[in-house]
Amino acid sequence: MIKERPIPVLEVFGPTVQGEGMVIGRKTMFVRTAGCDYSCSWCDSAFTWDGSGKDDIRLLAASDVIAELETIGGAAFDHVTISGGNPALLPQLGGLIDGLHARGIQVALETQGSRWQPWFADIDDLTLSPKPPSSGMSTNWEVLDDIVRRLSEAGRRFCMKVVVFDDEDLAYAKLVHERYPGIPFYAQAGNDNLTETDPAIMLPYLVERYEWLIGRTMADETLRGIHVLPQLHTWVWGNKKGV
Amino acid sequence: MIKERPIPVLEVFGPTVQGEGMVIGRKTMFVRTAGCDYSCSWCDSAFTWDGSGKDDIRLLAASDVIAELETIGGAAFDHVTISGGNPALLPQLGGLIDGLHARGIQVALETQGSRWQPWFADIDDLTLSPKPPSSGMSTNWEVLDDIVRRLSEAGRRFCMKVVVFDDEDLAYAKLVHERYPGIPFYAQAGNDNLTETDPAIMLPYLVERYEWLIGRTMADETLRGIHVLPQLHTWVWGNKKGV
């Protein structure tokens, strides 16, 4: 019997609310995997790839991850979000997804869309979140096209999400929406203040960023079917980790 | 030819973001109808039923409503939310819904579930929002059961939403979720401060109310598949009307 490859896990926490995107508000548990092929300038989870979190990485079997989810979350959840880093680097996640489904638990996952995995077609709430110019990364459109094509063929519910910090990012968001017109599209106001800890400063600033994005998108005829959302968890918990 | 019955309209505005529930963040136009069979203690649109807005009511044909939506929203929208009051008091809304669909525009509607209309089955995003004890209203469960049964038979996407102000409301929310277990369920933190105009006071208060509701629901095993959301528009615009 071939030994299952373990999963590099950095955090397991919850239940909490999903703060972004297509299932915003959903009660969910989080599993955060280590490792990323990107290094976005404004990444809010840089410890997953910049080396600073390396001592916290645990190599766990899928069954261990599920056991830990059940220890922490008890019977209070039926939804798990796999986050990163880029979980799409890990072919071995298929076993975890199958194990969760076997327990009646739904699975959400977000990835930048730089790498395909066959288990994408099994994710209940899949978000492809290509990164805009402000990230410093560049999009491989051929790979992204291929992922969108495969998911569409599989008849799978998924959405596109672009984080927007400035007008250049917004132009990129429009490009993405025009390239994949049939796919539900989310624009998210970016948080470019990752160090502020005072909610009295943080909260009005984030609301102002969200209001800016609303102002830039509402009258735009190329963004008719758009959702515009904040990162709700940063409004509640600021830059705190593990909530 | 039978003359179409006009629609009592109080407000037409947008495009803006939907601030609540199953399509939170969605770019949408709003049509607010006059009249309600309820008079919730904390209603944020009491002008639709308490007489204070009666001089603003216009009796419009469906085609006039659509023309006004297009004048205000141009070609920048593909989604309209019909709100109230209780729009379910108006059998004549079917023509408006058909007219919007004919233009490729999706329609959302929220109602307390006190009255069935055949056009419920045509709504793209329908929210049934029975009112908890703090409203001072009482739920007719037979009517609500009947509406849920008809919508389920029609294979229509819809959800349940309960606004929660206190623990008694939360107990009611659980009752609703247990009664309709297969239906996507949203709990929404209530805004019991309808007069505050200072965002520096309003915003932290609303965040605190939302955090309270998260705290009361996350560990609860009877609320596994729940979404917990704020009224996002009140976080951005406070108690302002028409945004």
Language-model-detected regions and their locations in the chain:
Chain A
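Short linear functional motifs in flexible/disordered or boundary regions
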Residues: 21, 43, 52-55, 172, ...
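Conserved AdoMet/S-adenosylmethionine-binding subsite of the radical SAM
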Residues: 77, 88-243
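Cys/His-enriched microdomains
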Residues: 34-38
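Short N-terminal binding/cap micro-motifs at the start of the first secondary-structure element
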Residues: 17-22, 39, 237-238
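Generic secondary-structure boundary/loop-capping signal
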Residues: 6-10, 14, 229-232
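Conserved Radical SAM active-site core
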Residues: 3, 10-11, 17, 27-28, ...
